[in-house]
């Protein structure tokens, strides 16, 4: 049901961004079917909605439509048109306001297959046993998203592909493997790996080098 709305969202996003609308790829539709994974995007006057909306090239505006596309699973099919009409005015307002908090809070996103490696200031003195050395050998995205850290708070998650020994920056990828339940500090506290960067504390689940997530 959600994937049927993706073309509509894409068209509206293209109009807002001044670009053209491209149909979602099969892997994008696969991601759309898993509401428990991917990014949590803050939508005004609505709860946090997990939805990556991976259009080719990673449209920022299409991400902004997450709340409109992520139709609650419990809505019966006959009521879907009424839900769309109910959400449409709010959607138009969100997209029309240049200062919309929805648009300001979202940055571009790339499909996992287009991940790029950007490593800065590597420290050659790091011991090879340092887990960060192992993690740094993987390619990572370099964008900022909003992740639901607890039920009532939203924190920034910033992704990096570089590190230092004394002030380590950690990683958050791949996008499709992120599980919002696993991103909760409360549930992963015993597995956290702590580090310091620029005077701030960063915490990372110790699960694997390809899915480390940092909290700020």
UniProtKB/Swiss-Prot annotation:
Q: What is this protein called?
A: Putative cat eye syndrome critical region protein 9
Signal peptide location:
1-23
List the keywords (alphabetical): Glycoprotein, Secreted, Signal
Q: In which tissues is it expressed?
A: Ubiquitously expressed with higher expression in heart.
Q: Please give an example of a GO cellular component term from this record.
A: extracellular region
Point out the glycosylated residues in this chain: 148
Tell me where in or outside the cell this protein is found: Secreted
- Could you tell me the gene encoding this protein? CECR9
Keyword flag Cytoplasm: no
Q: What remark does the entry add?
A: Candidate gene for the Cat Eye Syndrome (CES), a developmental disorder associated with the duplication of a 2 Mb region of 22q11.2. Duplication usually takes in the form of a surpernumerary bisatellited isodicentric chromosome, resulting in four copies of the region (represents an inv dup(22)(q11)). CES is characterized clinically by the combination of coloboma of the iris and anal atresia with fistula, downslanting palpebral fissures, preauricular tags and/or pits, frequent occurrence of heart and renal malformations, and normal or near-normal mental development.
Q: Which residues cross the membrane?
A: none
Q: What lineage is on file?
A: Eukaryota, Metazoa, Chordata, Craniata, Vertebrata
Where would you say this protein principally sits, based on its record? secreted
């Amino acid at each position: 049901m959600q994937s049927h709305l993706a073309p509509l969202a894409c068209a509206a996003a293209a109009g807002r961004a001044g670009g053209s609308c491209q149909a979602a790829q099969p892997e994008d539709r696969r991601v759309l079917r898993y509401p428990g994974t991917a990014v949590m995007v803050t939508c005004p006057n609505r709860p946090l909605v997990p939805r990556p909306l991976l259009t080719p090239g990673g449209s920022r505006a299409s991400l902004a439509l997450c709340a409109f596309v992520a139709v609650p699973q419990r809505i019966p099919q006959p009521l879907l048109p009424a839900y769309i009409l109910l959400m449409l005015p709010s959607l138009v307002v969100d997209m029309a306001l240049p200062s919309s908090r929805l648009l300001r809070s979202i940055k571009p996103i790339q499909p996992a297959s287009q991940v790029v490696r950007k490593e800065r200031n590597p420290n050659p003195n790091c011991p090879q046993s340092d887990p960060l050395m192992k993690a740094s050998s993987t390619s990572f995205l370099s964008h900022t998203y909003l992740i639901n850290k607890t039920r009532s708070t939203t924190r920034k998650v910033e992704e990096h592909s570089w590190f230092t020994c004394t002030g380590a920056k950690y990683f958050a990828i791949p996008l499709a493997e992120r599980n919002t339940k696993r991103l909760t500090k409360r549930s992963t506290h015993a597995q956290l790996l702590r580090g310091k960067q620029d005077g701030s504390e960063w915490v990372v689940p110790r699960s694997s080098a390809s899915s480390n997530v940092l909290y700020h």
